[in-house]
């Protein structure tokens, strides 16, 4: 089964997302999928809170004149804006945009709050719905008209040095987040023609899907003083002078969820990282006639023991065990514990890992400690496999001064190996003309194993 078909199929079978809503590019997070989303964004919120960010919530509606205030910024997506033009039957004097992103909204309010250097730094974030009128082929959780989980952070600083330090913090923070959810990535500095509109520069996180295409999963933008000058974000410096703040912004969306689903899944279904799994352990009682009560009593005891540390589900449905195994493998539950009469007699239980399929017999009297060890191994294995997967999709090619020869070499590598092709960095081919020659996207300038490369790939 091709990846595209597998992806659409697993969203339905595993109860992640239902795209049958009657608006293109809009769908519904189902309960199981929503829990994956919730646990993932809890990790992200914790990382932000621990680094001095404050969560907030801004309006969804943006007046047209406010959105248009930063001309270069709005040009980047003016064809994708949804507009509210009426209140009931009454035409509005000023059209209202459904939030495509929140720079203009937040910076209007920051002007009210920032007066002196002691008001800085200001580090805010929100997790909200955003709207883009996508005209391309929409894909669930990947390319949406309503992005249902957009975490955007916006910061303001007194100096360029503080602003640069914030970029480093954001990159480290996002790296830690993707490590936690076991999504591998490379970081690139986007080329000038592909940076965020209005930014000095953009750093981006990309991962690689099983079909060899890359997915942008996070961006970090250094805005310099560009937006501050437009929105008059001035403050009084310690020596009494006036200056504009320096700003950053950075975002992560539903693509993080799409990626953790896509990167580790297999022919059986999902393979979910432990920390974001709605159910971390599923208990399967093996019932035999005359032994039902003994088994159920013991497995309920086990359920109570494990629930002190893990999210556990006891599957006591009246169906065959094989059907239960299949159902929970589709949903990617990390560990399955089977318990039957013989296990009880022997003082044992059987643990099955979703990531490797390995079956491990453990002593029941020591089961909590054994589960903790296996969970730790599961986490480590998923991280190792994530790194291996992205390395297997990276190809370094030798530089050719002949642009046409180099482009043919890159196209051949993309065809044969897919993934990301790394070209030793050279200004002569770091341009849109080369991008057209290779019929792929220049992701940007990437450091890999201590060397600078131009990274190129076919993208979603």
Swiss-Prot record:
Pfam family, one: HGTP_anticodon
GO BP terms, alphabetized: prolyl-tRNA aminoacylation
Keywords linked to the UniProt accession: Aminoacyl-tRNA synthetase, ATP-binding, Cytoplasm, Ligase, Nucleotide-binding, Protein biosynthesis
CDD domains (alphabetical): ProRS_core_arch_euk
Entry keyword Manganese: no
GO molecular function terms attached to this record: ATP binding; proline-tRNA ligase activity
Chief place of localization: cytoplasm
InterPro entries with a match to the protein in the record: aa-tRNA-synt_IIb (IPR002314), aa-tRNA-synth_II (IPR006195), aa-tRNA-synth_II/BPL/LPL (IPR045864), Anticodon-bd (IPR004154), Anticodon-bd_dom_sf (IPR036621), Pro-tRNA-ligase_IIa (IPR002316), Pro-tRNA-ligase_IIa_arc-type (IPR004499), Pro-tRNA_synth_II (IPR017449)
Enzyme Commission number(s) of this protein: 6.1.1.15
Compartments where located: Cytoplasm
Reactions it catalyzes: tRNA(Pro) + L-proline + ATP = L-prolyl-tRNA(Pro) + AMP + diphosphate
Keyword field contains Nucleotide-binding: yes
GO terms under cellular component: aminoacyl-tRNA synthetase multienzyme complex; cytoplasm
Highest taxon listed in the record's lineage: Archaea
Quaternary structure, from the entry: Homodimer.
Family to which the UniProt record says this protein belongs: Belongs to the class-II aminoacyl-tRNA synthetase family. ProS type 3 subfamily.
Domain comment, as recorded: Consists of three domains: the N-terminal catalytic domain, the anticodon-binding domain and the C-terminal extension.
Role, per record: Catalyzes the attachment of proline to tRNA(Pro) in a two-step reaction: proline is first activated by ATP to form Pro-AMP and then transferred to the acceptor end of tRNA(Pro).
Protein name: Proline--tRNA ligase
Gene: proS
